[in-house]
């Protein structure tokens, strides 16, 4: 996953036992959130807004305070994260443009044209209360 590349770029090593991927149902998200909070992690990074909202829900149920006890961020910004209590720091990007670029790359590969192995799109960090 790309987030692992960022660790390498900054000379860091992720704590693998604290990485929970494929949390597709609320119960697995809740279990992962509880394990992370019990490990004394500083921050949770969620892959999307739905998972992030579920983490917040779990924390409220077990009286964990964001950002006092743990910080919370998401790779995907949405209206919901902007209006959560607390509002969640996230990445905002142009979804339509990303879709266009992805389709162009796929068509290029299908037609066996030259394509990029990596495509960079713009994004903006929406710094909010969950990390302050």
Kindly label every feature range from the protein language model.
Residues 1-132:
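Bacterial carbohydrate/catabolite-sensing allosteric modules
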């Amino acid at each position: 996953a790309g987030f692992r590349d960022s660790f390498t770029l900054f000379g860091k090593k992720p704590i693998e036992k604290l990485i929970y991927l494929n949390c597709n149902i609320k119960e697995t998200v809740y279990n992962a959130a509880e394990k992370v909070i019990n490990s004394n992690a500083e921050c949770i990074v969620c892959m999307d807004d739905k998972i992030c909202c579920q983490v917040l829900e779990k924390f409220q149920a077990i009286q964990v305070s964001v950002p006092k006890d743990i910080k919370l961020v998401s790779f995907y910004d949405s209206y919901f994260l902007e209006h959560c209590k607390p509002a969640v720091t996230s990445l905002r990007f142009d979804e339509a443009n990303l879709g266009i670029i992805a389709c162009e790359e796929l068509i290029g590969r299908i037609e066996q044209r030259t394509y990029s192995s990596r495509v960079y799109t713009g994004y903006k960090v929406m710094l909010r209360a969950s990390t302050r």
